[in-house]
Amino acid sequence: MAKMMGPRFKMCRRLGLNVVGHPKAMKRAGRGTSRADKKLSDYGIQLLEKQRLRAYYGVMERQFTRYVDQAFNSKEQPGEALLMILESRLDNMVYRMGFASSIRQARQMVNHGHFLVNGKKVNIPSFRLNIGDEVVLREKSRKTEMFVNNFKDSIGSEVPYVSKEEDNFKGIFTRKPKREEIPITIQEQLIVEFYSK
């Protein structure tokens, strides 16, 4: 499976965005000039924003382009539709539900088959959740202390479009998120403009 490679904290500095999920990522990235600090052309600004969003969700270029095509073909605003597609990926929702400390860790957990979606084992990080879908940590995976601690420590800090059942190690994708509820600082309209040319 293709992966986004490269020093993670260096990538944070280069893109001017915490794309690894670590709470101290930007501090550990150190000082230096990011692309976001440099004077860029309109095209350069749009390209940077696309790279920031792609890196945040850990999506490869080809798959990201497919998501963009789907967003443009939807009945919604392309930028918000794109964010909704990315946000509904299983690896991201595992992260939002508090099972993992980063999207990267969530992707590994999904790959290793630690979750059931509506009672069925799913090990595809790009699997898209629908509203009302339930994600449960498998019984045998609850023996891993890190997974249990991640979930319990995140109780009360989940996003508004997710609910959790602590005793059942369950997260539910309850509703479509509003744009302002998605916790990422990105100007999706710049990405729409990039692909509109």
From Swiss-Prot:
GO CC annotation terms, alphabetical: small ribosomal subunit
Keywords for this entry? Answer: Ribonucleoprotein, Ribosomal protein, RNA-binding, rRNA-binding
CDD domains xref list: S4
The S4 RNA-binding domain covers 88-150
**Any idea which GO molecular function terms this record carries?**
rRNA binding; structural constituent of ribosome
- InterPro entries listed in its UniProt record: Ribosomal_uS4, Ribosomal_uS4_bac-type, Ribosomal_uS4_CS, Ribosomal_uS4_N, S4_RNA-bd, S4_RNA-bd_sf
Q: Could you tell me the Gene Ontology terms of the biological process aspect for this record?
A: ribosomal small subunit biogenesis; translation
Coiled-coil intervals, chain numbering: none
UniProt KW Ribonucleoprotein keyword: yes
Pfam families of this UniProt entry?
Ribosomal_S4 (PF00163), S4 (PF01479)
Family as reported in the entry's similarity comment: Belongs to the universal ribosomal protein uS4 family.
Please give the function described in this protein's UniProt entry: One of the primary rRNA binding proteins, it binds directly to 16S rRNA where it nucleates assembly of the body of the 30S subunit.
Task: Give the HAMAP family listed for this entry.
Answer: Ribosomal_uS4_B (MF_01306_B)
Q: How does it assemble?
A: Part of the 30S ribosomal subunit. Contacts protein S5. The interaction surface between S4 and S5 is involved in control of translational fidelity.
Q: What is the protein name stated in its UniProt record?
A: Small ribosomal subunit protein uS4B
Species annotation = Clostridium perfringens (strain 13 / Type A)
